[in-house]
A protein has these predicted regions:
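Short acidic, glycine-rich surface-loop motifs adjacent to enzyme active sites
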Residues: 85-108, 132-133
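Active-site core segment of subtilase-fold serine proteases
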Residues: 1-40, 91, 186-241, 245-260
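Subtilisin-like serine protease catalytic core
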Residues: 1-75, 92, 126, 164, ...
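Short, well-ordered amphipathic alpha-helical segments that serve as non-catalytic structural scaffolds
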Residues: 79-83
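Hydrolase catalytic cores
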Residues: 43-46, 59-67, 85-93, 177-179, ...
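Catalytic-core regions built around general acid/base machinery
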Residues: 113-126
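Active-site-adjacent substrate-recognition loops and nearby beta-strands
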Residues: 105-115, 132, 136-173, 177-181, ...
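A short, hydrophobic C-terminal helix/tail in secreted or cell-surface proteins
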Residues: 385-391
């Protein structure tokens, strides 16, 4: 186990010795603990005594930093994945990596360094990386629109009471020229799309609005407009905020907007006309990873909260996600009859465990040395049940 919060790596012998001393009362506190229980629950489903791959060897990475910041950086996840693969190479074993984590920041097209890193890892070694697509399906945190030259498009954003801050990301093609305004419930209008203006600060009552327009970069030919509304005291103004697009010359016109994850927002906060089609979370947008959604209660149905979407480029369908779904509603944790969990975080380890067992059958037992990567994904999809198209 590698604990990123302390930088300490524990061998299996050290872990067993520490746990034995703890059970015997020789030590009062454990040097590493899963405070939320999320990681333990995921691990138990994937490879616990009653889990899917109960005989698997386990590599654990506790994400985080010594400062105790609750927000995980993408670089920490990348280092964790790299650690798992390097350990697997060291022990000459295939590895199934579980990532029950996702965020909404990014263009969701698989073109970020984070997503491309995951794809490269899937092609580098005998591994399978399984990632949850998130629980944003019903969250009202995404909107897709189409700009038309000379037209005005308004999308309304409801902000509930007691929101201390919120951010809005808009991703569009750089060749599409449009003036974008943020209009407060009290009528103040702010332009947030000025190119080459750097970071722009606005002040409205007790709020500070920070915006910046980012042009194309080495890995993305589009443009990002980012705006953050932060209360300097109390909370930001609740009510209906308007995001207005006044289009000039438009060649493509397609754009997306995302808010922070639904779990961080008030239930009253969200777009009034949300689009559920691009609600998968990053890195569940990775193209070569096995991206996992959650089944609903009805046979063959997807859970309504489960994220979904396609990687698109100029309106062309490239990859549809999730690749596969697994049970993710009211899942009983093995060994804990009282506890149930819901979400794609807990559907994902079921697929990770299945991937580990397929690699054991193929690689470890000598039945198929190429049972990893895209071939393993194809085997899972081929043997799965077809989903209901109406789900």
């Amino acid at each position: 186990m590698w604990d990123q919060t302390t930088g300490i790596t524990y061998s299996d012998k050290e872990i067993n010795s520490i746990l034995e001393d703890y059970r015997n009362g020789a030590v009062k506190t454990l040097p590493a603990r899963d405070v939320t229980g999320h990681g333990n629950e995921v691990a138990v489903i994937a490879c616990g005594r009653s889990g899917v791959a109960s005989d698997a060897d386990i590599i654990i990475v506790k994400l985080g930093n010594s400062g105790g910041n609750a927000y995980i950086r993408t670089t920490q996840i990348m280092k964790g994945v790299d650690y798992c693969i390097r350990k697997a190479i060291e022990y000459s074993q295939p590895v199934a990596v579980n990532i029950s984590y996702g965020g909404t920041y990014g263009n969701h097209e698989g073109s970020s360094i984070f997503e491309m890193f995951i794809d490269d890892c899937c092609s580098t070694y005998r591994c399978s990386i399984c990632i949850g697509v998130g629980n944003e399906g019903e969250g009202r945190t995404h909107y897709s629109g189409q700009l038309v030259s000379g037209n005005v498009l308004d999308e309304e954003l409801a902000i509930g009471d007691y929101e201390p801050q919120i951010s809005i990301q808009i991703w569009k093609r750089a060749m599409d020229n449009a003036r974008i305004e943020l209009i407060a419930p009290t009528g103040e209008r702010l332009v947030i799309s000025e190119r080459n203006a750097g970071v722009v600060h606005h002040n409205i009552k007790n709020m500070r609005i920070v915006s910046k327009a980012y042009g194309p970069g080495p890995f993305y030919m589009g443009e990002e407009i980012y705006a953050a509304i932060v209360a300097t005291s109390g909370y930001i103004t609740s009510g209906i905020w308007d995001i207005r697009f006044t289009a000039a010359n438009v060649l493509d016109g397609f754009f997306n907007m995302w808010l922070p994850p639904v779990s961080t927002l008030s239930s009253a906060t969200g777009f009034l006309r949300p689009s559920p089609e691009y609600t998968f979370t990053i890195p569940g947008t990775s193209r070569r990873a096995i991206c996992v959604g959650a089944n609903g209660r009805a046979p063959g149905s997807a859970a309504t909260f489960s994220g979904r979407g396609v990687n698109v480029k100029s309106g062309l369908l490239l990859y549809a996600k999730p690749d596969i779904t697994a049970p993710g509603v009211n899942i009983r944790i093995p060994g804990n009859k009282e506890k149930t969990v819901t979400g794609t975080s807990f559907a994902t380890p079921m697929v990770t465990g299945a991937a580990a067992m397929l690699m054991e059958w193929g690689i470890v037992k000598g039945n198929d040395q190429y049972m990893y990567g895209e071939k393993l994904k194809a085997c899972l999809l081929y043997t799965s049940d077809a989903a209901d198209d109406k789900a």
